[in-house]
Amino acid sequence: MAVKASGRFVPPSAFAAGTGKAFTGAYAWNAPREAVGRERPLTRDEMRQVQGVLSTINRLPYFLRSLFTSRYDYIRRNKSPVHGFYFLTSTFQRRLWPRIERVNQRHEMNTDASLLFLAERDHYARLPGMNDKELKKFAARISSQLFMMYEELSDAWVDAHGEKESLFTDEAQAHLYGHVAGAARAFNISPLYWKKYRKGQMTTRQAYSAIARLFNDEWWTHQLKGQRMRWHEALLIAVGEVNKDRSPYASNHAIRDVRARRQANLEFLKSCDLENRETGERIDLISKVMGSISNPEIRRMELMNTIAGIERYAAAEGDVGMFITLTAPSKYHPTRQVGKGESKTVQLNHGWNDEAFNPKDAQRYLCRIWSLMRTAFKDNDLQAYGLRVVEPHHDGTPHWHMMLFCNPRQRNQIIEIMRRYALKEDGDERGAARNRFQAKHLNRGGAAGYIAKYISKNIDGYALDGQLDNDTGRPLKDTAAAVTAWASTWRIPQFKTVGLPTMGAYRELRKLPHGVSIADEFDERVEAARAAADSGDFALYISAQGGANVPRDCQTVRVARSPSDDVNEYEEEVERVVGIYAPHLGARHIHITRTTDWRIVPKVPVVEPLTLKSGIAAPRSPVNNCGKLTGGDTSLPAPTPSEHAAAVLNLVDDGVIEWNDTEVVRALRGALKHDLRTPNRQQRNGSPLKPHEIAPSARLTRSERLQITRIRVDLGQNGIRPQRWELEALARGATVNYEGVNFRYPVNDEWPGFN
């Protein structure tokens, strides 16, 4: 029988306080699972949209196509087809595709300059994804078409003026240059001397040099490779692959490309020597290169010595220092950062989409406003000098750091002028006053340490161990490779002095023998500059050259140049540095610093002598099947067809036999057949990149070439732009149909037998 308790009971203990975390279960088997549900399939309309966007992606270059297709496949597999649909329609189609289109529009063929290469428009649009082999073929086609155009124009000029000598005038060459160079401008290049042509100052010699470049396949290959690299990088910037979250400063492809080119250049330098033209003496080329400012370590030390010298000179003159930062407007930045501290995120800047500016455009903007500032300094009799450093933001947009010194009474006025021009364009946008222009006063003795970090970051990352980049949060030592790749890709000079004597004269003075005076040859002013450069005291060098902001013609020492004995591949004289001269003593009074004439030659291959470490070995079996040569049975090897043909030609030269002898014809035919490689008719090349060889058409006669010019003009009046093969067919008498209208022109035959 149960005992019934009465009275009060002790209440149970309180529940444990919650941790705020979701229940996960004590074991794996009772952990919460996602609800079982069926994913929503795409509708028919959504499937059509997906197929349309994928077809657009498939038309992109491979490096972009693979990027988007792999990202779409990853989202579709790991999330759902609906998420993949949102990625294609929202992220790509609405946000990224307009940026890609705008970049391609900025780099497409300039048909306003010329319509000659209209047939190559689609091929030129594939340039950012073009391989080297296809690019070289494309360059060869461009140069050959320009050469044919030049020949046709030359023949037309001779027919109009009567004599061939009329071609060798400034007027004729300027006329030919205008047409050929104008057609070349369709590929977004600026031909040499184009500005002089527009001003009417073109000479025959200048026209020859410029046109020779336009006929050179290698010159076009170099131009197209540069465009391909910048177009490729601009597309990666547009799709957000260059920023602090992906690859800061430059894309991974650009970093690899620059590293590969530098490695190839290094291997070339290792394979060459410097040879004395007179004595034949040879020295290692790579050792001389690594001992010059081409070595990043030496270049960094020279810059640091220059900064320290500028600071000492400013202290001696009583000038004060400023640290200026100039940044381009927001429309030059492809991305923007949102948030603060570690929570900062990168977002696309839609204000960039209208113009799609690249880093080179931002650099041109900064150079333009700096030229306006310098003009204002000159108008107000203000002087500043120092050093300029260009470095990129995390998205590749450049900004300037300037270490300037000036008179204390002029500092406020200089800062106000710079601020006014820095904010002249879009100065009312949000954050412009704070971010577009910054000016800090430098304490005496702290300038070198303040800017040293920027120099190391832009060269080799020296002494930056443990320091982090403000833009990316990554170690500064690791960002040096990306910054140098950025500068190489966009052809942006990173360092430049402002208002200081030339560095070329400083380096030439340091080439002179140590401690040897040149006062007897020049005067004490020149000797003071030599002694300052010899000791590496850049402050004394500035003073010896006349001080800061001195025009070059008024400096004490300048670099002397002289035309070289050799000409380049375009038959131009090449000026080379030979020494120094003092303008106040006359330009003809030159001191030669480069007395030896060197040339770059390949290294002589080292041939190791044949070493026989063993004597005659015993035969592997008692039977010797080798025959023994005797004196009477020795037979000479039969001559090859080439050797036989050479012997026959010697007999012809000696007058023993005649050219029309059947033996001569038979010998030459045999030599030619022997040297030619016999093609295998049973095998065909199935590669689409290697088209089958097509026999070239017959050469056009002179009358047919003249007929082509008349046909092109006649068709142009009807609004027709014919291709090259159509013009040749019409000149030979064929009939060509253009939009239902047949065109045929009479043939001017030069063969009287066919009349």
Regions found by a protein language model. Give the residues of each.
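Right-hand nucleic-acid polymerase module
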Residues: M1-G396, P408-N755
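Short hydrophobic/aromatic beta-strand micro-patches
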Residues: M403-N407
